Amino acid sequence: MLTVAEGILLCFVTSGSVLGVLGNGFILHANYINCVRKKFSTAGFILTGLAICRIFVICIIISDGYLKLFSPHMVASDAHIIVISYIWVIINHTSIWFATSLNLFYLLKIANFSHYIFFCLKRRINTVFIFLLGCLFISWSIAFPQTVKIFNVKKQHRNVSWQVYLYKNEFIVSHILLNLGVIFFFMVAIITCFLLIISLWKHNRKMQLYASRFKSLNTEVHVKVMKVLISFIILLILHFIGILIETLSFLKYENKLLLILGLIISCMYPCCHSFILILANSQLKQASLKALKQLKCHKKDKDVRVTW
């Protein structure tokens, strides 16, 4: 049984996850309409893939959390562990790959650098995405053996703390290799944000001689993209902190309240960042405002029918 505080927090994280699925579903729907209208772009493709992956991430986090709360014996089963581990590696790595690709796409489209390497990357943006896709496949090929290794050690020493049977250095190396792709894409996101800051600084210096209106428009674009990138980095850090809290609370402390707090923190990244993307993207923002107006009109029509 859950306490009152645990029940309230569980309702909160469940409601937030539903909103996150709806937000990502809206991005998916808006890009599907653009695809039907033959207005599908590279950014649209990345946003679509990102929305799909984040819906799966939310579902995995919430379903796994509910199982840990109400059916912990199922979580301890071999079948559940191996299936969830493989699915999590694929979906989580792919989600961060799409987010990093989006950040890099914004950098190449908005930033202005005179270096020939930047011009080369800007002209061959598809090649850059293919390179990142190759990095994703390499990260999978490294992560899968580490997942099997950790699972086998846990299976052999089921009744004892299985971490004891891995040397400390080996244990750290195994988890670094397991998340090597995530670490790489996270570093790319940080570098992208740093380059955008430099681009904004150079842009402000160059635009001092031009009209203030032109300057403000370009600066606004830079600042808007920087907010998206910084929010991504912060939320991703919180996401992994939440997963760590959730895992430790289940394996070591067996604290349900701490487990639910971990769920809340880990769900913030896939849920909140989707709404940040909607507000930062002019097309998605207009589509969301249009959808809200249609809902209001539908509600008014329904109220009028009820009064009659």
From Swiss-Prot:
Q: Which residues lie on this side of the membrane: Cytoplasmic?
A: 29-41, 100-124, 201-227, 279-308
Instruction: Report the membrane topology from the UniProt record.
Output: Multi-pass membrane protein
Cystine pairs = none
Q: Return one GO MF term.
A: G protein-coupled receptor activity
The record lists the membrane-crossing segments as 8-28, 42-62, 79-99, 125-145, 180-200, 228-248, 258-278
Q: Extracellular topology: which positions?
A: 1-7, 63-78, 146-179, 249-257
**Can you say where in the cell this protein is located?**
Membrane
**Glycosylation: residue positions:** 159
Q: Which InterPro entries match?
A: TAS2R
Q: Mind naming one GO cellular-component term on file for this protein?
A: membrane
Q: Which family does it belong to?
A: Belongs to the G-protein coupled receptor T2R family.
| General remark | Several bitter taste receptors are expressed in a single taste receptor cell.
The UniProt entry, under PANTHER family, shows: TASTE RECEPTOR TYPE 2, TASTE RECEPTOR TYPE 2 MEMBER 106
What is the protein name stated in its UniProt record?
Taste receptor type 2 member 106
Q: Which organism is it from?
A: Mus musculus
- The gene designation is Tas2r106
